[in-house]
């Protein structure tokens, strides 16, 4: 999977709460074009949270496709994600989309890519985007070694990613299930 130089999305589940966060920076070449973009959303009547890293237009198009699949499969996130990944890999139009997504409901958390990947992590922590490795590392350390809430873990992980990754800012949007 190629590294997406665009943003950071981090998602953590703990004590029945699922929290997703995304930074607001949009970078075009070497310039910051916007500092307050919204790259995370709630879908399917607010029961599923989704975030994307990569091209904004592509990420939004994929969110729309995922929402269609969720409606078709009555909110079954795993089934919708697998069907989206199959379409994404085989459809001529979708194959060109450059984004990676994370999605979660109250029970499952998934990374979805155009390579056909639908990955559920071993631990309830995922992060994607250019600052994803930093955010995931910080979130895993906090998850394993503290009693912080999911929200506190996500906030701190995003803060750390924003301090290290030049494509990630500290203008964080958070959604919670």
From Swiss-Prot:
Highest taxon, organism lineage: Bacteria
InterPro entries tied to this protein: ATP-dep_Prtase_HsIV_su, Ntn_hydrolases_N, Proteasome_sua/b, Proteasome_suB-type
Keyword Phosphoprotein tagged: no
GO cellular component: HslUV protease complex; proteasome core complex
Activity regulation field: Allosterically activated by HslU binding.
EC number(s) per entry: 3.4.25.2
GO molecular function: metal ion binding; threonine-type endopeptidase activity
Reaction(s) catalysed (UniProt annotation): ATP-dependent cleavage of peptide bonds with broad specificity
Residues noted as binding Na(+) in the record, renumbered to the chain: 162, 165, 168
Entry keyword annotation includes Ion transport: no
Any Pfam family matching the protein: Proteasome
Location relative to the cell: Cytoplasm
HAMAP family reported in the protein's UniProt record: HslV
Protein family (similarity comment): Belongs to the peptidase T1B family. HslV subfamily.
Protein task: Protease subunit of a proteasome-like degradation complex believed to be a general protein degrading machinery.
Subunit relationships: A double ring-shaped homohexamer of HslV is capped on each side by a ring-shaped HslU homohexamer. The assembly of the HslU/HslV complex is dependent on binding of ATP.
UniProt protein name: ATP-dependent protease subunit HslV
